[in-house]
Amino acid sequence: MKVEALDKFWADKSRYDLAEKRFYEGPQKVTDRSHYSPLVSEIAKAREHIQNSLEKIDGVTLDDGLNSELAKRLAQLEGEHKELKTQVSLLNELLTATVKRLETQLKLTNGVSKEPEVEAKKPEANDDDDDVDLFGSDSEEEDGEAARIREERLAAYAAKKAKKVQIIAKSNIILDVKPWDDETDLKVMETEIRKITQDGLLWGASKFVPVAFGIQKLSISCVVEDDKVSIDWLTEEIEKLEDFVQSVDIAAFNKI
């Protein structure tokens, strides 16, 4: 540009036009820069504000309300932590006491506290004194006393056992006795049945129960001692009364 300005004559028209264009465009660019200067200022301010905000965050700059809320939360967490530690300590103590108690019970169960058996020492025989019995009379008296005590204890045990009441097993039975027909005299049949006697057999109440077509059956109860009276024997004895009895059934059987 400077070199071309010194020339008094430009032979190239295009170069002249380009120089003129550059001449006029120079002030316009300066004007555009001055026009956009407020925008550049705003951008600079925004950058400065962002930079200040970042510096505050890095320095953990918080307001008073947020600081008090955090302090309360920290105090609450510390209290809960102390309470948990106390509860854990109590649980450990309780567990230790329970384990000790169980160990003591196991020792007692396994017979740790059993009394040691004391074995009586047998007196050693002296070969030199075999022919001489210096305490013969005393040993005989002791043997007699021990035998007497043993006999007394055996007698007392036998007497105690004899006085003990023995439980006798008994059964309550209800028998249904069916006659041949309606002409059978049930009263006579009952009388014949009651004539059956045995040690341990006791006859009870009886009644006539209708069956069908005017026929009745005899329902009679009895109590028997299980060791003395057999149910099979009793039913066989009743069935022997063939003139009256057709069949015998056990209606009920209960232990007493």
From Swiss-Prot:
Q: Which residues cross the membrane?
A: none
SUPFAM superfamilies, per the entry: eEF-1beta-like
Q: Where is the composition biased (Basic and acidic residues)?
A: 114-125
Q: Which SMART domains match?
A: EF-1_beta_acid (SM01182), EF1_GNE (SM00888)
Q: Does the keyword Phosphoprotein apply?
A: yes
Keyword tags: Elongation factor, Phosphoprotein, Protein biosynthesis
**For this UniProt entry, what's an example GO CC term?**
cytosol
Name its GO BP terms in alphabetical order.
translational elongation
Q: Which family does it belong to?
A: Belongs to the EF-1-beta/EF-1-delta family.
PANTHER family referenced in this protein's UniProt entry, alphabetically: EF-HAND AND COILED-COIL DOMAIN-CONTAINING FAMILY MEMBER, ELONGATION FACTOR 1-DELTA
Instruction: State what protein this is by name.
Output: Probable elongation factor 1-delta
Organism from which the protein derives: Drosophila melanogaster
